[in-house]
Amino acid sequence: MKKKTKKLLIAGGVLLLAACICVPHICSVQIRWDGITRIQSMNIPAKLPKGAAAVKEKISPLLGGTVMGFALAGILIGVILFLKKTARAIHRKLRILAVLSSFFSMPLHELMHAWACPAGSEVHLGIVPEKLVGYAVTNAPMNLAQFTAYMAVPAVAIGILPLIGALCLRKHHRNQAQFMFIYGMFGLVQTAPDWFGLIPVLRQAPADAVVQISNGITYWFTR
């Protein structure tokens, strides 16, 4: 009982610390709720300086769609669990819970995009039912570090960190480790379009570049 109480206190302390860090910054961002809308609402125009260069992006049509991405992750995880003997120990309901938890963490995914935006940025949040996706779009200019945070924070939080947690728990807390592994795998697939948007920018834009999104296209320029 004492161990459970200690764990709950630690978890509560971590959540409180996270709230103290995240809440003040998210309040400094101007959030505009677009509601349930169409894919075109994600295309917000911005005033670009002359000479701004469009980033050449190559997005995989397979991973670019959330439904297909989740299907691919399901197949991959199924193969891994089939080959892994320890997979027999995890209850089927726990697997389903992990998948659903990842799917319903999409709003958190978009809020983390908004949190990573520079203070004072206007961020549009919405849901596109036809694609089964949400979005958090800003046309605020960002330096390369800010843009990297904007694109990568969700993948770290709901993909990489759960996988690290699974590795740490695998010996003594097998069920929790399996849950975090499945959640993290789906989290990485869910954030795959972010990586496809970030990597071309890092390859094409110089270190002192300013990055700005306009009408769904990413541009970079120097001042």
Which residue stretches match the model-derived regions?
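Active-site-flanking alpha-helical
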Residues: 112-120, 161, 201
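Metalloprotease/metallohydrolase-associated module, dominated by Zn2+-dependent proteases
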Residues: 7, 11, 21-80, 129-223
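Short pre-active-site segment immediately N-terminal to the catalytic Zn-binding motif
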Residues: 90-107
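Active-site recognition of the HExxH zinc-binding catalytic motif
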Residues: 105-118, 154
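Positively charged n-region of N-terminal signal peptides that target proteins for export
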Residues: 1-6
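Final/C-terminal transmembrane alpha-helix of multipass membrane proteins
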Residues: 16-20
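Membrane-interface helix-boundary motifs at transmembrane edges
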Residues: 85-93, 170-174
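Membrane-helix interface/capping segments
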Residues: 86-90, 114-128
